[in-house]
Structures are given as C-alpha cells and as structure tokens.
Amino acid sequence: MNLLIMGLPGAGKGTQAAKIVEEFGVAHISTGDMFRAAMANQTEMGRLAKSYIDKGELVPDEVTNGIVKERLAEDDIAEKGFLLDGYPRTIEQAHALDATLEELGLRLDGVINIKVDPSCLVERLSGRIINRKTGETFHKVFNPPVDYKEEDYYQREDDKPETVKRRLDVNMAQGEPILEHYRKLDLVTDIEGNQEITDVFADVEKALLELK
C-alpha cells in the first residue's frame, strides 16, 4: 500500500503517520529523515543537498525530488509499500512525484488528509507557554500550569497567534493545489482531525482497509 498523508501544522499528522506505520507496516518516509539518511549515506543527492545546507541555502526542488526518488527506489518499498509524510509540499513536487512513481513502476493508492478547522489549529498552536525559570513547556488550554502567573511565562515568537496564522495561510496556499490534483485522481480521503486521537485513527484505519 502506497500512501501520502497531508494536514496543516497541528492537525496531528505526525501522530497518525506513526500509527499507520505501526498498524500497516509500511515504510515511513518523512522529508527530514530522508535528508538525514541521504547525507549520512553520502548518496549523490545527499551530497548535493549537504552542499546547499552547509551554505545556509534552500535545497532546490530537483535535489529534494532526487532524494525522494532514491528512497522510493530502495528494496523495502516494493516489499512493504510507503507512507510519504511532508512531501510533496508544492504542486511542482506533486507532478515530480507522479513522474517518479511512473518511472519506478509504482502507484499511489491513497491520500489521507487530516482536516481541522484553522481557527482550532491557531488555538492549539498558539497556546504554548514556557516557564522563564525552569524552561518547562505548558499549554494555556490543554496543559495549564497549576500556579500560573503571566509574568513567570513567555511565548516564543513562532507560537504567537499572528505568526501561527501566517504559517497556516502559507501551508493552505501550498496544500490546496496538491489536494485538488489528487482529488481529480479520486485518491483523497478527508478525515475529521478535531476529535480524540483514537477516534481519528479509527477513521483512518477504516479508510485504509477499504483501499486494501
């Protein structure tokens, strides 16, 4: 089974990806892990990626696409299938993935899209606060400190509501064309992500069992 998982930051995509891998035994292919492995193994694309990263530059699409292709060509993929997580990030990468899969004789079986209302995600992501003295992390709503005093806590710039909203807007602008592309191919299953983790996975599992 060859899968792609999508969802906005904070939607719980990583949690569900781990559960899918555990339950279905597919190879988990996350962008970060792929880059680290390619650089550690000094593959052709890994060396290229490292040359950009060492200079503090963005890795071009053709290198990222090349690293994905190297990983998808490995033996375990044909045997176990895969779950792509964090790629493609742009419609151009989605088209490159289509070409790679065709070249390798593989096909995508389904796209799981974890949907959560953006306003809920802003609350989830912007509630994180850090204790100035201990460095402990809490959440204003989901894990509040017992003795909360505003002056004892601070919030990282990345966690402020306006920053979170901007990040979500960018992700939505990039993600929508990708989802639309896969919807036209009748590959997308939308999963309601604003429920308990176990309930989300029950819906994911049901959708995947129907694909088998």
Curated annotation (Swiss-Prot):
Pathway(s): Purine metabolism; AMP biosynthesis via salvage pathway; AMP from ADP: step 1/1
Annotated region (NMP), positions in chain: 30-59
Ranges where the record places region LID: 127-159
One Gene Ontology MF term: ATP binding
Keyword terms: ATP-binding, Cytoplasm, Kinase, Nucleotide biosynthesis, Nucleotide-binding, Transferase
GO term, biological process aspect, one: AMP salvage
A Pfam family reported for this protein in Swiss-Prot or TrEMBL: ADK
Gene3D superfamilies, alphabetized: P-loop containing nucleotide triphosphate hydrolases
Binding locations of ATP: G10, A11, G12, K13, G14, T15, R128, T137, F138, Q195
Enzyme Commission numbers on file: 2.7.4.3
Residues where AMP binds: T31, R36, E57, L58, V59, G86, Y87, P88, R89, Q93, R156, R167
Tagged with keyword Oxidoreductase: no
GO cellular component: cytoplasm
Main EC class the enzyme belongs to: transferase
Subcellular location: Cytoplasm
Principal location class: cytoplasm
Domain notes: Consists of three domains, a large central CORE domain and two small peripheral domains, NMPbind and LID, which undergo movements during catalysis. The LID domain closes over the site of phosphoryl transfer upon ATP binding. Assembling and dissambling the active center during each catalytic cycle provides an effective means to prevent ATP hydrolysis.
Function: Catalyzes the reversible transfer of the terminal phosphate group between ATP and AMP. Plays an important role in cellular energy homeostasis and in adenine nucleotide metabolism.
Similarity section: Belongs to the adenylate kinase family.
Protein name: Adenylate kinase
